[in-house]
From Swiss-Prot:
Pfam families: Holin_BhlA. May be involved in the secretion of the autolysin BlyA. This is SPbeta prophage-derived protein BhlA.
Amino acid sequence: MEMDITQYLSTQGPFAVLFCWLLFYVMKTSKERESKLYNQIDSQNEVLGKFSEKYDVVIEKLDKIEQNFK
């Protein structure tokens, strides 16, 4: 019985260590990637906000021009 357990641990131990290391490595890189994506989304939202302000100004000017032609 003891021989079976020690044999099992000796064969599966390295794979368990490798699995745990790989799991933590993937979790760490995923967290870094997620934070980069959130930063990129925030910067894109800022740019889109500026475009929407400019778009509103253009719409107002077009409305004024349209009213002048009526």
